[in-house]
């Protein structure tokens, strides 16, 4: 089907048409390239293979569909001033437009809920956060978007007369549909996301305050500890689980018998003795050397990369200093204390590698979760800024069509600002997330190297 043969006034001058066409063509290409890069990064980068990143793959796919199936036809409709294509395709085009836009914001809503559950119910939810579960949530997101986008195909509403006899392709103008679709596609998910992120902020703030209190408490406790004796080991230090037959030498020399220590194999009463983070200043040097070779290169490397962005407050289950493990009585004889220290080095050398490796991995994971939550907050904020003007003016026209209608030119500007959002997520990931930065650099450099050869 071809367009009408009649002559009509073009909406833009030749220069404006060329500029708009060039800008939108660049937008289309950049959107496809950037979001394809996001999909490749998640599927090929080890640091981005977490199940929750499948949300980003689906979101990027929706943005690519907007760039390929929606924006080109919107551009033609804008520049020509009428709908050049088949009437049936107009109805499908409008339904797909609503589908992809709704899918994007419902994806962001699902991501924010995933963040909230990961923060508020970390142990319980992380064990259930499997790829299969995430895929089911993504399928539900697309089904919700499809339900909201179906009415334009089923009920077309009252058809307005076409100006100058030219075919037009416009959104449903029924007030009930405008309000229902705006609430379901934008305002309700936005409200959910805002409330969820406020809750995440409250939880993070509370954890931060608890962490500062724990730090102050540990600082006061350390200030009361006795100064270390010769050799760098505190004079009051002992390792629980250490008992030596040579401790009887102290009794034979006239020293009082020290209090009973726990037998090997018993669980220490101090819960902090169960996990030893790598606080080097508090560990014997031989243990430090042992730790350097046994803690796992991958965990240390990840922690070093995230060092500048590590959370200020660690969970309270992670002890602030391994020095808290050592806490023996002052009257313990020197011979027994030295022997206990030596045996303590042997004991620590067996366990510190595993414990501190787990500590580093947990620390790196928490840092990555924190940064990823911040990135998603930026993504949601940018989405709201881009789409709010359109949905607000669209709803306003349905509430009071006579007096509150937004001028057509301004409405079209809001319309295109919303489309621009599809190209922004890859930029946000690049600016705010070093895992994506490294993955993008690796993919692009590999492609350029292969092309150069």
Swiss-Prot record:
GO terms for biological process: angiogenesis; G protein-coupled receptor signaling pathway; MAPK cascade; platelet activation; regulation of smooth muscle contraction; regulation of vasoconstriction. The chain crosses the membrane at residues 18-42, 55-80, 91-113, 136-158, 175-198, 376-399, 409-432. Residues 43-54, 114-135, 199-375, 433-453 are cytoplasmic. GO terms for cellular component: cell surface; plasma membrane. Residues 303-314 have a biased composition (Acidic residues). The record marks 97 as: Implicated in ligand binding. Keywords: Cell membrane, Disulfide bond, G-protein coupled receptor, Lipoprotein, Membrane, Palmitate, Receptor, Transducer, Transmembrane, Transmembrane helix. SUPFAM superfamilies: Family A G protein-coupled receptor-like (SSF81321). It is a multi-pass membrane protein. PROSITE patterns: G_PROTEIN_RECEP_F1_1, G_PROTEIN_RECEP_F1_2. Pfam families: 7tm_1. Disulfide bonds join 90-169. GO terms for molecular function: adrenergic receptor activity; alpha2-adrenergic receptor activity. Residues 1-17, 81-90, 159-174, 400-408 are extracellular. SMART domains: 7TM_GPCR_Srsx. The record marks 181, 185 as: Implicated in catechol agonist binding. A lipid is attached at residue 445 (S-palmitoyl cysteine). Residues 214-329 are annotated as: Disordered. It is found in: Cell membrane. InterPro entries: ADR_fam, ADRA2B_rcpt, GPCR_Rhodpsn, GPCR_Rhodpsn_7TM. Interacts with RAB26. Interacts with PPP1R9B. Interacts with GGA1, GGA2 and GGA3. Alpha-2 adrenergic receptors mediate the catecholamine-induced inhibition of adenylate cyclase through the action of G proteins. Belongs to the G-protein coupled receptor 1 family. Adrenergic receptor subfamily. ADRA2B sub-subfamily. This is Alpha-2B adrenergic receptor. It comes from Mus musculus. The lineage of its organism: Eukaryota, Metazoa, Chordata, Craniata, Vertebrata.
């Amino acid at each position: 089907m071809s367009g009408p043969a009649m002559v009509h006034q073009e909406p833009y001058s030749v220069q404006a048409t060329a500029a708009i066409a060039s800008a939108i063509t660049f937008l289309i290409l950049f959107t496809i390239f950037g979001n394809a890069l996001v999909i490749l990064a998640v599927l090929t980068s080890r640091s981005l293979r977490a199940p929750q990143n499948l949300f980003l793959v689906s979101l990027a796919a929706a943005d690519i569909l907007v760039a390929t199936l929606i924006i080109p036809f919107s551009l033609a409709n804008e520049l020509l001033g009428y709908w050049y294509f088949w009437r049936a395709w107009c109805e499908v085009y409008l339904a797909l437009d609503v589908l992809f836009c709704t899918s994007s914001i419902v994806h962001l809503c699902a991501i924010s809920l995933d963040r909230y559950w990961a923060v508020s119910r970390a142990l319980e939810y992380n064990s259930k956060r499997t790829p299969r579960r995430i895929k089911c949530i993504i399928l539900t997101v697309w089904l919700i978007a499809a339900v909201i986008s179906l009415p334009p195909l089923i009920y077309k509403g009252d058809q307005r007369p076409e100006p100058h006899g030219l075919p037009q392709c416009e959104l449903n103008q029924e007030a009930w549909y405008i309000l229902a679709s705006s609430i379901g596609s934008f305002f309700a998910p936005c409200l959910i996301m805002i409330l969820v992120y406020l809750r995440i902020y409250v939880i993070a703030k509370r954890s931060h305050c608890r962490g500062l209190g724990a730090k102050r408490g540990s600082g006061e406790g350390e200030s009361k500890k006795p100064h270390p004796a010769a050799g760098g080991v505190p004079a009051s230090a002992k390792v629980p689980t250490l008992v030596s037959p040579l401790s009887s030498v102290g009794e034979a020399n006239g020293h009082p018998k020290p209090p009973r220590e726990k037998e090997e194999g018993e669980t220490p009463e101090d819960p902090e003795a169960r996990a030893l983070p790598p606080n080097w200043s508090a560990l014997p040097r031989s243990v430090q050397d042992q730790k350097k070779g046994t803690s796992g290169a991958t965990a240390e490397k990840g922690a070093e990369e995230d060092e500048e962005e590590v959370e200020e407050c660690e969970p309270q289950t992670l002890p602030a200093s391994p020095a808290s493990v050592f806490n023996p009585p002052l009257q313990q004889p020197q011979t027994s204390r030295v022997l206990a220290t030596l045996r303590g080095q042997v004991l620590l050398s067996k366990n510190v590698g595993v414990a501190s490796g787990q500590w580093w991995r947990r620390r790196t994971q928490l840092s990555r979760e924190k940064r990823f939550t911040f990135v998603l907050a930026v993504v949601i904020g940018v989405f709201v800024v881009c789409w709010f003007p359109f949905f607000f003016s669209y709803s306003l026209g349905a509430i009071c069509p006579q007096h509150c209608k937004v001028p057509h030119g301004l409405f079209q500007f809001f319309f295109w600002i919303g489309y621009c959002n599809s190209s922004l997520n890859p930029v946000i990931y690049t600016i705010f997330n070093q895992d994506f930065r490294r993955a993008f650099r690796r993919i692009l450099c590999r492609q350029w190297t292969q092309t150069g050869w």
